[in-house]
Amino acid sequence: MIVAGGGMAGLVCAVRARELGLRPRVLEKGTRAGGSMLLSSCVIWRHLEFDEFRAECPGGDEALQRLIWERLDDALAWLVSLGAEPVWEDTENPRTTGKRFDPRSLTEVLVRAAGDVRLEERLRPELPLVLATGGFAVRYAHEHGLLVRCNPWSEGDGLEFALERGATTAGDLDEFYGRAMPAPPARIGEEDYVRLSQLWDGEARFVNEDGDEFFERLPAWHESDLAQAVARQPGGTAWFIVSADFREDPRVVALREAGGTVVEEDGELRLHVAAAVTHTQGGIKIGPAARVHGVDGLFAAGADVGGISTGGYSSGLAAALVLGRIAAETALR
């Protein structure tokens, strides 16, 4: 079995396939395994109540949402059984439950268990095939003049491969999960993606480059809605305005030290930010068995799949974990 992509979904799929007696081969076009999981805070979570999941992501596929919600706890226990040690035994969010892992340690555990992981290898046409190439965040960001907040290889290879073979899409191809990050000339490395995120939990006002306030409600708890709103402003940038009392706040200090722009005037700080794309939320349409609609012998998992979090946000790593396991189990049938 060929698995395209060596991030969370692809590695999980390969590990589960080996457990079931298959001989998977993971083809990762990048220079390292781990995908965007390696760059994340690595919290793998679900909503406490399924109704909250539906309310948070009302446009998503209800069957896929329920599948992820119902199977995540067992999938997390399976990760731990492989030797992955949680950093947190639960989330710190009263709306959610899950576990946090060290992303490097988790990647190492999965790579060891996956077996045949080949780097700098691209998609091949052999089937059965599992697509787990990480969506098209990089392509989307470049097309729209936004920052990239993910691994540099999520360019839509899986989506293109599937569409060429008759697949259809699900979800909104213009919807993404992302963050507001320090705007250029700030210097942002992969190791800064979590640390430099500008999350202000209702303590900021938001104006665009024309000085117009563009987001006059409280952001959602995850603030991805705010990042998407910033992306729609001229230049994909904005100014977050907070009290000058925050001048030594870690978020302000980090932005300033990264070379970002902080302007203090009239008792306020103006922080220059830009929208950054972590992963796309539209993508390949699949069913509950992770089969790609319209293409025999083709499966998909992770950010290549669309239509799970439409209209809101849910854990991309949770979807990758659950669907990666299911893809392996379905391929065995």
Segments from the language model and where they lie:
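N-terminal Rossmann-like FAD-binding beta1-loop-alpha1 element of flavoenzymes
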Residues: 1-26, 328, 332
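Short hydrophobic core segments
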Residues: 2-4, 27, 126-135, 299, ...
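Short, small/polar residue-rich loop motifs at catalytic or cofactor-binding pockets
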Residues: 7, 199-201, 278-280, 313-314
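Conserved N-terminal/central alpha/beta ligand/cofactor-binding core
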Residues: 29-115, 203-220, 239, 245-247
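A conserved short coil-to-beta-strand element within the FAD-binding core of flavoproteins
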Residues: 116-126
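Glycine-rich loop(s) and the adjacent beta-strand/alpha-helix scaffold that form part
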Residues: 131-185, 317, 323-326, 330
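An anion/pyrophosphate-binding glycine-rich loop and adjacent beta-alpha core
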Residues: 161, 165-264
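A glycine-rich dinucleotide-binding beta-alpha-beta segment and adjacent secondary-structure elements
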Residues: 261-311
